[in-house]
Amino acid sequence: MSGSGAMEGQLTLRAAVLGVALAVLLSAANAYLGLFAGLTVSASIPAAVISLGVLRALGNANVLENNIVQTAASAGESLAAGVIFTLPALVMMGYWPDFPYFQTVLIAGVGGLLGVIMTVPLRRALVDDSPLAFPEGQATAAVLKAGYGGAGAAGLGVLAGGAVAGALAKLADSGLKLWQGAAETSVTLANQSSFYIGSYLSPALLAVGYIVGINIALPILIGGLFAWWIAIPLVMAFSSDAGTGVAATQAVWSAQIRYLGVGAMLVGGLYALWGLRGSLFGAFGSTAETVLPSQRDLPRSVLITLLVVLAIPMAVLYVWLLDSIVGGVIVALVMLAAAFLFSAVAAYMAGLVGSSNNPVSGVTIATILMTAVGLWLFFGAEQAGAASAIIVGAVVCCAAAIGGDNMQDLKAGSILGASPRAQQIAQMLGVVAAVFVLAPVLSLLLHAYGIGPVDAAHPNSLPAPQASLMMAVAQGVFEGGLPWDWVIGGGLLAFATIGLDGVLARRGSGLRMPVLAVALGLYLPLSLSVAIAVGGVVSAVSGAKPGEHGRGLLAAAGLITGEALMGILIALPVAASGRPDVLALDLAGLPLAWPGMVLMAGLAGWLWILTRRDTSAH
């Protein structure tokens, strides 16, 4: 069977058209949501559910065709995240008066396509030859299989029950504001050190922890506990103006401690690539004759050609920005190297916690730091240097966002028996479709609401929190004030974690300390790490075994599906009205925390019961 024959019934015209349409819609919706709230909604599972309904109504659909639709559609959402986390910084710093169409399309398109290209040689290393869970990939595959009867009537009922529970919880929490999104408090000692205690009340995070298991959830929690129970209290103890309480701990984390995670991600990413060197060389060295047609990736000749074609216009842009041919070429090479490094890091971390919880902003900060320092050393403190660093960061952020999403989709495809080449083409289609609508959408939002801090002219301005952080990092290098000590400290912690993991490996310990999992814990809010850890504990005590796809996995997939779908539905009236509380019930005493805690406990118990019953049946 030829390579094209392996794609028959998958990359159909109607699948491509539907995938492109969903990519455009979801990229526009997530552009607003990301600027407004600082987060985006994962599109793989919602797109899978939508495509199930549309393609089955058209007739003669199959699960692999649906998989192509969600692959293309999810690219739009991921690209939107890369764009809105970075490019608004150029507007806020005054370098761009608006979002110029050609430059926005070029930066986003190059970054998104690089994300696909850079992760092609990683597929076998991370998906085929790795124990990484890719929780959203598993959940997407479970949804699609259930939709075509692969789970049976009972399994489909479990999936639907989880989806209803996840959707209602999201509606009550984020829409109606019946309870708080997180249960949190703090304990303050006599020396003014505050210890944060809390957890997100998110069924989807509980499900992610259940899917990845305790061996990944625990190192993430350990990283979080180090940041929030050791580093932050120490900073507060020796600072006279840090304050106390939950808000104070979060302020210290935002300004200083999360840079530990940035440094750790940088070192951990390089270490992870070194560990994957054998698989990478094997991927580059394989030939078409050594791989089954159904398992072939895009050819190396195509990847290399695309790489050159994408690099040339970016090099020209950097030459124009810096007014230096040598400088522009060097920055373009740095961009390519950083795109490969951090696409790999994002792909690896998507395997740990899923693309929804992937800290793409962390790898973007690391990129902007490295680029800005180099530009400052060679070109001095000029605004063009800060802008160039932001643009490099934007390309890498788009590449990392697409890289993590691409690997998640390829995991789903691996479970379903899909053609990797067909999925990689679908990802590129989704990227190309989304780039042409993001520039006008961003310009529309800029003129309608404003982007950046609220002022008299823009009382409803969209805060764009990640882009504000990127601007602060880039300008901080040229103007001073960045917490370099914390970045370096994070790198040293990564080296220590690598050493500890080596000791555990030599002793044959069942507990390991993967450095990127610990780095993730250092960077993320502790409330997120705790919610994932709870799911990991449920998985461990219920006897769930990695790789098994029983009713517990279907329930977890349902929880993720319901929350993701409801997140998009809630975003529609919020976007239309410009009010985050448009659905909130104005009732005295709301929101509360305890109803969400009771719900989380009940869902944890449900996952435990389902898994125990499956375990007992075997």
Describe each PLM feature range:
Residues 1-618:
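Alpha-helical multipass membrane-protein architecture
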